């Protein structure tokens, strides 16, 4: 029987993209809870914003995260919000921060969350042993 030559499944490509750098997995985990601006992520991880932007762009290119967009009644006053015009209903179209795409959510649920859970369990066991000493 001839070997079937085929492409890797797309999910493996996307998982590989995330795990090329541990910070990408951390970014994905962090934004799985809520939309965040790159500066907020950089501050939380104590990493320069340009490094965070580099990883965000790679994750965007891979289709795992996207820029969060919404419509607002009033002109936004906070920093880091981009105004993209007005909708037909007269609301401001704004974009800010990043959020997971459907594929990104799948990656977090299938691969990243279980890894963090195992890591947290190991940490709890370690702490418990220290307390018993």
Where are these regions (language model features)?
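Amphipathic alpha-helical dimerization/coiled-coil segments
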Residues: 2-11, 29, 84-133
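Short helix-coil-helix linker/hinge
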Residues: 17-24
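Hydrophobic residues on short alpha-helical segments
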Residues: 25-31
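A short acidic, leucine-rich amphipathic alpha-helix
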Residues: 40-44
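Short capping segments at the starts of secondary-structure elements
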Residues: 22, 33-39
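Key DNA-contact positions within bacterial/archaeal DNA-binding proteins
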Residues: 50
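A short, conserved structural fragment
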Residues: 60-73
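Short, hydrophobic-biased segments on the C-terminal half of alpha helices
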Residues: 56-57
């Amino acid at each position: 029987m001839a070997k079937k030559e085929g492409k890797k499944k797309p999910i493996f490509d996307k998982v590989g993209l995330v795990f090329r750098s541990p910070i990408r997995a951390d970014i994905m985990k962090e934004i799985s809870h809520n939309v965040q601006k790159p500066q907020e992520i950089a501050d939380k991880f104590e990493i320069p914003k340009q490094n965070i932007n580099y990883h965000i762009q790679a994750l965007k290119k891979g289709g795992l995260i996207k820029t969060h967009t919404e419509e607002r009644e009033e002109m936004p006053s906070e920093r880091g919000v981009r105004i993209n015009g007005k909708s037909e209903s007269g609301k401001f179209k704004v974009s800010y921060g990043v959020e997971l795409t459907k594929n990104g959510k799948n990656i977090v649920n299938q691969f990243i969350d279980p890894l963090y859970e195992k890591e947290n369990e190991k940490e709890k066991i370690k702490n418990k042993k220290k307390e018993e000493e």
